[in-house]
UniProtKB/Swiss-Prot annotation:
Key words of the record: Cell membrane, Flavoprotein, FMN, Membrane, Oxidoreductase, Pyrimidine biosynthesis
Primary site of residence: membrane
Protein's name according to its UniProt entry: Dihydroorotate dehydrogenase (quinone)
Subunit structure: Monomer.
Cellular compartments annotated: Cell membrane
A GO MF label: dihydroorotate dehydrogenase (quinone) activity
EC number: 1.3.5.2
Recorded topology in the membrane: Peripheral membrane protein
Cofactor remark from the record: Binds 1 FMN per subunit.
Gene label: pyrD
NCBIfam families, A to Z: PRK05286.1-1, PRK05286.1-2, PRK05286.1-4, PRK05286.2-5, pyrD_sub2
Domain of life, source organism: Bacteria
Sites where the protein binds substrate: K68, N113, R114, N115, G116, F117, N174, N179, N248, T249
Pfam family, any one: DHO_dh
Length: 339
């Protein structure tokens, strides 16, 4: 059945297909229709897991970027995910980069996007999170507005942290998208140190205010040198971050040279990212020595490479591009088998 749906949406522009799918899932998440979707999916229960002090119904999650505004939380939830990461969301709404900005690399099962954090703003997303009936864990992925100077970038993250804290199962600090100018600079040196210090200070204040501890993860890029990775791992440990998501999309085109759309600018996700993200997880795991849990993301399209990420050191997994190419059966297979 999904093959028919995929054939139809693949006739459409990639972003229009994405928006259409979100609307379908929003409708399917409606209390009137959700039982129908659940009966079609027959999602298995999966294996509960506690990571970052949070109880996840199963270790398979939806990666950020799929549901930027939290419009289809209940629809995605019906597919069987143990957790959903909504966003990336910024303090105020922004249009993102010029269209077209999403491109399929069908022969490689990859996607290039240069969206640029298009979203309706944090307040809109929080309302959707508050209204969701989904019983799994909801993570909120936060970023900075495009026109906020890098030097003031931490203010945007603190603003979003304040808004999201009471409604999130966990919060992800996204400093690794290649589509916001200079954003990845926040992964390095004094910027990184200063950002994490500010975030941890604010987390302590909010934990006291709301009488609960909400863990904070950092999402990193796959395009890191060995020394950069070591430095990032050291900084994460030093600031006692609660988790790390490895990885975001890649700007490398080594695995897709010569393919249609490979020349498009932006972040490449899907199967071409599979090996690279697993290698980063493996190296990160060696550096972190179990002190900080890793959430693995990047190119998961089946049980074998999902298991490879677990063996490399990931405790939770996230999918997105694989869902586009393989449909809900991918989620079902992973939930049924990954512990």
């Amino acid at each position: 059945m999904y093959q028919l749906f995929r054939h139809g949406i693949f006739q459409m522009d990639a972003e229009k297909a994405h928006d259409f799918t979100i609307q379908c899932l929003k409708l399917a998440g409606n209390p009137l229709f959700q039982p129908i979707l659940k009966s079609l999916i027959h999602a298995p229960k999966g294996f509960p897991k506690t990571v970052m002090g949070v109880n996840f119904p199963n270790p398979i999650g939806l990666a950020a970027g799929a549901d930027k505004n939290g419009d289809a939380i209940d629809g995605f939830g019906a597919l069987g995910f143990g957790f959903l990461e909504v966003g990336t969301v910024t303090p105020v709404a922004q249009d993102g980069n010029a269209k077209p900005r999403q491109f399929r690399l069908i022969e490689a099962e990859g996607i290039i996007n240069r969206n640029g954090f298009n979203n309706n703003g944090i307040d809109y997303l929080i309302e959707n999170v508050k209204n969701a009936r989904y019983k799994g864990v909801i993570g909120i992925n936060i970023g900075k507005n495009k026109f906020t100077p890098l030097e003031q970038g931490k203010d945007d993250y603190i603003f979003c942290l304040n808004k999201a804290y009471n409604y999130a199962g966990y919060i992800t600090v996204n400093i690794s998208s290649p589509n916001t100018p200079d954003l990845r600079q926040l992964q390095y040196g004094d910027y990184f140190d200063d950002l994490l210090r500010s975030i941890k200070d604010r987390q302590a204040i909010l934990a006291n205010q709301y009488n609960k501890y909400v863990p904070i993860a950092v999402k990193i890029a796959p395009d890191l040198t060995e020394s950069e990775l070591v430095q990032i791992a050291d900084t994460l440990v030093r600031h006692k971050m609660d988790g790390v998501i490895a990885t975001n999309t890649t700007i490398s085109r080594d695995t897709v040279m010569g393919m249609k759309n490979a020349e498009q600018q932006g972040g490449l996700s899907g199967k071409p990212l599979q090996h690279k993200s697993t290698e980063i997880i493996k190296r990160l795991h060696q550096e972190l020595k179990g002190q900080i849990p890793i959430i693995g993301s990047g190119g998961i399209d089946g049980l074998q490479n999902a298991q490879e990420k677990i063996e490399a050191g990931a405790e939770l997994l996230q999918v997105y591009s694989g869902l586009i190419y393989h449909g809900p059966k991918l989620v079902k297979e992973l939930v049924k088998n990954i512990k």
